[in-house]
Regions:
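Mid-core helix/loop region of P-loop NTP-binding domains shared across ATPases and GTPases
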Residues: 10-15, 114-120, 128-218, 222-229, ...
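Walker A/P-loop nucleotide-binding motif
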Residues: 65-86, 90
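Conserved AAA+ ATPase "sensor/coupling" helix adjacent to the nucleotide-binding pocket
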Residues: 122-126, 244-255
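Conserved catalytic segments around the Walker B and adjacent sensor/switch elements
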Residues: 69-71, 94-111
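A short, basic N-terminal segment
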Residues: 1-68
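C-terminal helical "lid" subdomain and adjoining coupling/linker elements of P-loop NTPases
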Residues: 256, 265-326, 341-346, 364-370, ...
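Terminal-proximal interaction/regulatory segments of ATP-powered molecular machines
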Residues: 347-448
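Short amphipathic alpha-helical interface segments
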Residues: 325-359
């Protein structure tokens, strides 16, 4: 263990490095690049219609009336949470100024596994919003008792409440039978009926946020009738809108640290991924973090490209967590074909990839599966959105083969798969593997 002087020196060194990192950072206000931050109205882009609708629907809360229930739907990163949170924040401030008790109770349903857990999370968040004790344990009592406590908190502390259920379609619950009512259906019925049944003295409205345009089709008939929401549709952002979103967060960075073209290329990458503003903002932030790590005072295009690769690698790694070794090996064999090819390959012939797979099983001392098994593994890779496939003919009498195109950069896929210790041996034999890949490509296309 270090003595007193060494410990003091270490503390000073850590403190100095922390201060230096803050002082030399390219960021001025990094919080502006948090996709979940509630932002000012002048930073909102391309959502005028949705903003108008939600303002109209929530205005009754300031007039002593109940706002309608709402269903906000559209792909991820299209501004659903951003807009509802921004409007609710303004309603809260105006209501407080005129002496009304308005509450906003939010939960994200992504990680909530059951109806009971969702109700407890509502109780907990309502208690926090009201500044009172939760009053019930997480387990050991019935869901109805937790609901009673939730209604009690709302009645005692608020005149009007909006309950925001983000990613509500993920609150499926434990369905023992495909015909069982999903947990979100039961919860929506209970919340939307609470005022009508006299369970709550004030006004209660529910805003459900989902990516699924067919969400209402899965609701129980009673829940659908009781919830009866006003729909607000959020389409994808286009590249110009994404660019404008980033421009309005430019002041997250210090003056003159952004190289020309940083914002357009960040927007272009995100536009390729279904116009997701959340991903555009993440990419814009990660580029700055990479510049900070490299102790550079300018955010360059190379940092954005590195950030895009990091994002792809993280996404790929997450998706690959549950894949077996054979599935990873099949995907790896396919990915290295365009990476190692001396030709410009846009698509990978399954014939070539399978032969490379056979070679890899040999050098890695892994079991060799049949061609049909390889094709089955790649079909599964397609369902995970790693690749797309197309059947191709090679002329009369030459048969048909599949060709695979990678959704993300195949080099990123290959590098990510190499992190599995069972595939490390392939990296050690890189020169040999390259020669095999190109020999198989030449044989396929030239018949040598």
């Amino acid at each position: 263990m270090p003595d007193g002087d060494d410990q003091k020196s270490l503390s000073q060194s850590i403190k100095g490095r922390l201060q230096e990192g803050v002082q030399n950072s390219v960021f001025r206000d990094k919080g502006l690049l948090d996709p979940d931050a509630v932002i000012d109205e002048d930073r909102i882009v391309g959502r005028d219609d949705q903003l108008d609708d939600i303002i109209t629907y929530l205005r009754p809360a300031l007039q002593g009336n109940r706002p309608p229930n709402m269903l906000l739907y559209g792909p991820s990163g299209t501004g659903k949470s951003l807009i509802i949170n921004a409007v609710c924040q303004q309603v809260l401030e105006l209501a407080t100024s005129q002496g009304d008790r308005f509450g906003v109770i939010k939960i994200n349903c992504q990680t909530i596994k059951s109806h009971d857990r969702a109700v407890y999370r509502l109780v907990k968040n309502a208690a926090e919003e009201a500044g009172v004790d939760v009053g019930v344990p997480e387990s050991g009592i019935s869901t109805d008792q937790k609901l009673d406590r939730f209604y009690e908190i709302l009645s005692n502390n608020f005149d009007s409440v909006i309950i925001i259920l983000d990613e509500v379609d993920l609150l499926v619950g434990r369905q023992r039978d495909p015909n069982d009512e999903p947990a979100y259906s039961k919860l929506l019925y209970q919340l939307s009926r609470a005022s009508q049944l006299g369970r709550i003295e004030g006004h209660v409205s529910v805003a459900a946020l989902t990516n699924d345009p067919r969400f209402m089709e899965d609701l129980d008939g009673r829940a659908e009738s009781s919830f009866n929401p006003q729909d607000v549709v959020f389409p994808d952002y286009d590249a110009n809108q994404l660019q404008a979103i980033l421009e309005r967060r430019r002041d997250a960075y210090q003056d003159n640290v952004l190289e020309d073209g940083i914002i357009p290329i960040s927007a272009a990458f995100a536009a390729q991924d279904h116009g997701d503003a959340r991903k555009a903002i993440d990419l814009f932030r990660k580029a700055g973090e990479i510049a900070d790590r490299a102790e550079e005072d300018t955010v360059r295009e190379a940092h954005v490209r590195d950030a895009q690769k990091e994002a792809e690698r993280d996404r790929t790694l997450t998706q690959m967590q549950g894949l077996s070794t054979q599935k990873k090996l099949s995907l790896y064999a396919t990915a290295i074909v365009p990476v190692y090819s001396q030709r410009n390959l846009n698509a990978v012939p399954s014939t070539v990839a399978y032969r490379v797979y056979q070679y890899l099983t040999d050098i890695l001392d892994a079991a060799e599966k049949s061609r049909d098994s390889y094709l089955r593994y790649m079909n599964e890779a397609e369902t995970y959105n790693f690749v797309t496939s197309e059947k191709r003919g090679r002329g009369y009498g030459s048969g048909v083969h599949k060709e695979y195109t990678f959704v993300d950069d195949p080099e990123v896929v290959a590098e990510t798969l190499q992190t599995d210790f069972r595939l490390e041996g392939a990296e050690h034999e890189e020169d040999l593997v390259k020669s095999v890949v190109n020999a198989q490509i030449d044989d396929f296309f030239d018949g040598n």
